[in-house]
Regions:
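Fe(II)/2-oxoglutarate oxygenase catalytic core
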Residues: 1-137
Length: 137
């Protein structure tokens, strides 16, 4: 499995403010390919802050967003939400990287991001859900 992984703790300067903004949004977008609910695409200050941090993490001058995908949105999976193995990146034409930023204080133990080579294999990588942690893969 040839997969890169970047884990950045304390990713946002003011995660409590971003979380507060996120909780004020409507979560009504249901997608059959991913669990939970999502908001519409974000932009503005949050996008600028995330882009700046990602440029440093990846050592690049520009971030090219794949706007055909669910880019820069908040997702909510409440307790009891069914989750399953799914693909966040569908191929080279739809983005080389995906990322999750955790903004839940005191998350459920054993929650986080798991990476599988395929549905037929065991999990290759597990990264815990830690408040203000970005996981890029």
């Amino acid at each position: 499995m040839d997969r890169n992984l970047i884990v950045l703790d304390n990713f946002l300067e003011d995660p409590d403010y971003i979380r507060k903004r996120a909780l004020e949004l409507d979560y009504d977008r249901v997608q059959s390919s991913v669990p939970g609910l999502r908001t519409m695409r974000l932009g503005g200050d949050l996008q600028i802050e995330v882009e700046g941090k990602l440029k440093i993490a990846f050592g690049c001058k520009e971030i090219i967003w794949d706007m055909t995908q669910d880019t820069l949105c908040f997702q909510s999976c409440m307790e009891g939400t069914e989750t399953w193995i799914h693909k966040d990146s569908q191929g080279e034409d739809q983005g080389e990287w995906a990322a999750v930023l955790y903004l839940t204080p005191n998350p459920v133990l054993d929650s986080g991001t798991g990476i599988w080579e395929s549905h037929d294999h065991d999990m290759n990588i597990a990264v815990g859900n830690v408040y203000n942690r970005l996981v890029a893969y």
